[in-house]
């Protein structure tokens, strides 16, 4: 995407979703800024643009998208509609009712899977989702994400053998 278009999307997301205060992140770290994924994911215009832009980052050969619940499900749906690639949902933990599965939807043994994520700090949730996909027989070939907060996710994913393709970096949306 041309830089001006990407910056326009980043600016719109910043206006809608950047909160200032004292926040504890999923990783346990603290931050003066919180990029509220639900605020940008629930805006249809932003979600449509994100689906289009993230679709361009999905690795060639991807047969299935995998989206960790709850935050990445809307994004995964937008990317699936843009690419035509089917998706599945990765639960944080298997439920003790219904089918009791950790992966909802279809994941066929041996499929090449791209994870879709929203905001990554250390990548811990993404690594847990990748482990669940691998345990279910999928081959994780990449991860596309909206925002890399640049606090270790890229290195942690690389160490796990997962190519990471973030759409935006911290400096694009969060003040220095």
Regions found by a protein language model. Give the residues of each.
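Active-site-facing substrate-recognition patch
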Residues: 1-57
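Conserved acidic residues
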Residues: 63, 111, 141
């Amino acid at each position: 995407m041309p830089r001006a278009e990407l910056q326009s999307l980043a600016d719109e997301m910043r206006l809608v979703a950047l909160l200032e205060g004292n926040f504890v992140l999923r990783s346990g770290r603290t931050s003066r800024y919180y990029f509220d994924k639900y605020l940008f994911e629930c805006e249809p215009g932003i979600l449509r643009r994100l689906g289009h832009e993230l679709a361009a980052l999905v690795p060639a050969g991807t047969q299935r998208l995998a989206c960790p619940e709850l935050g990445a499900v809307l994004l995964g749906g937008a990317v699936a509609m843009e690419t035509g690639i089917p998706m599945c949902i990765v639960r944080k933990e298997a439920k003790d009712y219904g089918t009791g599965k950790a992966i909802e939807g279809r994941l066929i043994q041996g499929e090449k899977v791209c994870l879709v994520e929203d905001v990554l700090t250390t990548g811990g949730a993404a690594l847990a989702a990748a482990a669940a996909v691998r345990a279910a027989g999928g081959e994780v070939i990449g991860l596309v994400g909206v925002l890399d907060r640049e606090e270790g996710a890229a290195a942690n994913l690389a160490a796990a053998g997962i190519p990471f393709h973030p759409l935006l970096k911290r400096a694009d949306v969060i003040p220095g």
